[in-house]
């Protein structure tokens, strides 16, 4: 949007960066060229890898299937604890992989037998045009589109972006505005707005992830408040993943998150009536597995990303018939925990 002073205001995310000719926004990948904002990384990737869908993490979306994952560079948040900082803070585009058109990516996913493509490693909101074009090309081949995102998107852009997505994992980094301001240079409310939008105004399957950082966002008081908001606004059936922090980027002074902390968070969330609460980044079979909210039967056993016992039939518990929220196929996938880096040129 052109402003009276001659600057252009980018309307993609809540930062609403105001830039002069040649300047870039906070994300560094969107640049003013003439009278418009241009995505400078369109068609460029930081690399492609076939992963288990559970790694996104998505536990209730096509379990056991493979997903073709990729990202670009840059980010519209400034998280001091970023676990993918080498990608999200990249400024040298020549280090990105070879160019990849949406059609090439869709064809590669099809030839690799992937049921979905994930926009991940850095936030797809900042490369929305590219992500949308890839999602549309994939849809033509029956392949789903997954966004792994912090949910930091403006009201103007939210509907357009998510109407092209089939699933998402949204990163709820904390439940205080102070945390977002101090450690992410952002705000909490736009993320909460995205979560409510996904739940009440779309058919996008989504799950939520919170990285628990010792001493920053893991207090009982904050976890109780977050869980109460979650139950009231999103309901009991949206999965929530509590994952372990490791020291990285500009936050090297904090210890690793303990399994006990993750278990405590899981118990608090479940005490508020949430049905599907998981732990991640640690070896915890109980915390990673899905149990029936109706009878307590083990439905999907997970050991890291390996699936074990499976007691679902037509999306229902085999023991009591309780319908399990999610997107399930008649048979579970068999990709297992494999990680397969790929070069698109060798496939397409």
What does each model-found stretch correspond to?
Residues 10, 19, 28-29, 40-44, ...:
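Generic structural "secondary-structure junction" signal
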Residues 99-260, 265:
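Conserved AdoMet/S-adenosylmethionine-binding subsite of the radical SAM
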Residues 16-40, 84-94, 299-305, 324-331:
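Iron-sulfur (Fe-S) cluster-binding segments and ferredoxin-like electron-carrier domains
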Residues 12, 26-29, 74-77, 81, ...:
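Short, cysteine/histidine-rich loop/knuckle motifs that typically chelate Zn2+
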Residues 23, 75, 176:
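A generic "binding-loop/recognition-motif" signal
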Residues 1-21, 215-348:
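Auxiliary Fe-S-binding modules of radical SAM enzymes
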């Amino acid at each position: 949007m052109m402003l009276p002073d001659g600057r252009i205001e980018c309307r993609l995310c809540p930062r609403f960066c105001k830039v002069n000719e040649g300047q870039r926004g906070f994300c560094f990948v969107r640049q003013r060229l003439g009278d418009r904002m241009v995505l400078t990384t369109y068609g460029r990737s930081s690399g492609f890898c076939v992963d288990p869908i559970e790694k996104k993490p998505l536990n209730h979306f096509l379990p056991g299937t493979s997903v073709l994952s990729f990202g670009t560079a840059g980010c519209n948040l400034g998280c001091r604890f970023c676990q993918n900082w080498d990608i999200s803070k990249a400024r040298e585009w020549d280090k990105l992989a070879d160019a990849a058109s949406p059609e090439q990516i869709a064809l590669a996913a099809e030839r690799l037998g992937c049921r979905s493509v994930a926009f991940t490693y850095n936030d797809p909101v900042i490369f929305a045009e590219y992500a949308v074009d890839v999602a549309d090309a994939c849809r033509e081949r029956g392949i789903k589109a997954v966004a792994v995102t912090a949910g930091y998107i403006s009201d103007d852009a939210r509907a357009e972006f998510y109407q092209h997505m089939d699933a998402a994992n949204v990163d709820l980094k904390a439940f205080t505005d102070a945390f977002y301001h101090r450690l992410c240079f952002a705000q909490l409310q736009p993320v909460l707005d995205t979560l409510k939008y996904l739940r009440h105004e779309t058919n996008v399957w989504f799950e939520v992830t919170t990285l628990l950082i010792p001493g920053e966002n893991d207090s009982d008081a904050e976890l109780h408040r977050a869980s109460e908001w979650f139950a009231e606004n999103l309901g009991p059936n949206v999965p929530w993943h509590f994952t372990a922090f490791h020291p990285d980027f500009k936050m090297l002074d904090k210890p690793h998150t303990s399994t006990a902390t993750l278990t405590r968070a899981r118990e608090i969330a479940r005490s508020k009536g949430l049905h599907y609460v998981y732990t991640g980044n640690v070896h915890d079979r109980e915390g990673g597995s899905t149990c029936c909210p109706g009878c307590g039967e083990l439905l999907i056993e997970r050991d890291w990303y390996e699936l074990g016992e499976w007691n679902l039939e037509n999306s229902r518990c085999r023991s009591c018939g309780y319908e399990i929220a999610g997107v399930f196929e008649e048979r579970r996938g068999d990709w297992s925990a494999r990680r397969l880096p790929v070069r698109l040129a060798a496939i397409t």
